[in-house]
Amino acid sequence: MEEKRKRIGIIATRNDPVLLYAVRELKRYLNASASLEAEEREEPTEERYDGYIELVIGHSLPNFSFGIEPGFDSGTGKPVLRLTGRDATGVLHAVYTFLEEMGIVFDISGPVVTKSFEYDKIWDLKEFVVPAVKWRGIRQHINFPMDISSYSLPDAREYICNLARLRMNCITFHSYPGQWYDLPSGELAGNFFYGQRYPIPRQLSPYIANENLFCIPEIERHDEDAPSKSQAAIQWLGAVMQEAKAVGLKVRFSVELRDHLDRAGLEICDRILALYPLIDELELITQECGTWAYPVLPARELEGLIAELFGPEVLEDGAIRRILAEACRETDEDTKAFINAGIWQLPGTLKELSNHIRLANELLASREERTVPELALGLYATDHSTLKIIRRILETHMPADVRCSLLPAHGARAVENSLKAMEVDRELMRNCMIYSWVEFDGNMYLQQNAVEGIGQLLKFLTTSQDNKQIYGINLNHWRTAENKTAAKYGSLTMIRGYIEPEEFYESYAQSLGIADTPRYASAMALLDETDDQVRNRLSNIGFCFADCWWNGRLGYFGAYEPQRITTIREEYKRVLELFQTCRIDTATANGSNDLELIANRIECTLIHLNMVEVMTQLQAVCGSLPPGTLSEAQKHDVISVCTRALGYCDEYMEHYCRILPDRGSEGTVISYYHTLPSVIHKIMELYVTGSIEESKPDSHADAPPSPAI
């Protein structure tokens, strides 16, 4: 005889949309259990319920806190579990804390039910959480095919819901020019992926949820009508923001004003705020690394630029002059010039920061005339000398009521190093959003793991803040399924505080039913270390934008050292062996699927490294020769090398397509098709035919800066 389902009454006020969402989520998962049945009730008065779960906002609780408290109802004598939070978002997070205790694993790729709910366990749960980080979330560049900017609206909404299920409470959307806002001057939105187009080739069409062009599926029909596409893009992002607000996320919007000064910059801000009234915080951020657009300046001229932009008083204590002196060396009798790899970042960063400070002050002063949300000044710079100088300028020039955001490095481990070098002070960090990485876009085509870097950042910030709550961390994120482990770790450590990676790996593997948890932990740790070596020794070897691979000659293929590729490849092989061993005794579907995906992606990584290594053979064939000067034998060698490399490209895409768990995986493979094979064909054409003009990449609406390697 089938056991009768236990009936639970859910009690909550109905005056808050986030609370209503919390009730729906709780009912959804309780009713999915074979042993439970849940209904909404106004108060615990009916005898037919076996117990009650009450959702309560506790205004006296610490900010951002949430908890679980068992008890009994005095009227009915029935057990009551109170899920409490400082606000409605906190209550929602208490709901997810409860559900995870009951046996659900929430991942960025979706929930996983790992065991049946036990009714009696409900009434023994007790927990109270003051998160280590106040504002916890994701930073979406919405700029590449593998992130949510290619998702259908239902898929994008579900992604947002999964962030809430990870108990995140913040999302930052970044828009490059021409992508997500239009302007009265006639510039349109809808130039997705920097304006680079991704027609779907026949070999990939069975795997892609578009007819002819890879983009948001609902917007594909607008492709030939630029104004219509622009409006559709804005409506799509507005709907995603609406979902974010419904699940309790703070919405931050980040924009680069570039050379739009004063009135032009204000018009952009006004337009964005008119298009997206749900924005809680507007961030004006400098371009990545100050861009290549500004000339390198000698130290004396740079001192003059600093004094011109921020006043001569910022130089008076000598600290900035000392930083400049340490960052430079003598290049002639009279001038110290910036010569290290990152020092060119400073002029552009200074000019844009100065402009943003003026605009922030003007926005604040005009609050009676316009609706102004919270404001932030963002800095995207990775050079340590630049960061040190900017930090000192912010100490005296940061407007009141304006927050700071820092994106200080490429890659999770490097963020902590940059903050240490920057010598951040406690006062600046008190209201500062730090951007780190779930994955680094420079290694997008490789399997990554950012757990160690995220953890070290938490540990550093906690220490530097004297163990007080950290203001905010948002993690850059593109691919979903491939990076769910790092995203899970990030979400947990931002709540609990620093967690030892090994402890996390073993617990996470156990929850998924992976058999050999110590071996899984070893595999993930080695993957993390190998990923960091790639970033340090093979910079941007997995970058996903064609123009950055090709400079009119061999591009990146002319820079990589084959021996380094060989060394890294051997490390990835070791990682793969560990994961394959884990698969042997893993019987659960959840664990097997997880291991199968990561093994596939490491195999793809090895194929990609093979391709790049083959292409480096051209260094000896034509690396020192101008196009159009090769002998017939050399041209034959170019064709042979490129043909072999293209074979590896086909193998990569074929293997990747064996497991496509989400839209981001589709985006990765279509991006690969239009990046590496395209560049290889251009190189082959250039050196075999000598046709330089025809081999130049297509122009785009915008492009990421080509990183130095």
Where are these regions (language model features)?
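Charged, glycine/proline-rich intrinsically disordered loops and linkers
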Residues: 184-224, 300-344
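Hydrophobic, small-residue-rich alpha-helical packing segments that form membrane-like cores
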Residues: 243-250, 261-336, 349, 353
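Conserved beta-strand positions
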Residues: 140, 173, 281-287, 377, ...
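Conserved, mostly hydrophobic/aromatic
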Residues: 30, 87, 163, 284, ...
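Substrate-binding groove of N-acetylhexosamine-processing glycoside hydrolases
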Residues: 20, 45, 124-125, 292, ...
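Feature activates predominantly on carbohydrate-active enzymes
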Residues: 2-25, 29, 61-65, 69-264, ...
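Short, well-ordered secondary-structure micro-motifs within conserved domains or adaptor modules
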Residues: 39-64
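Short, acidic/polar
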Residues: 149-162, 264-272, 387-391, 453-463
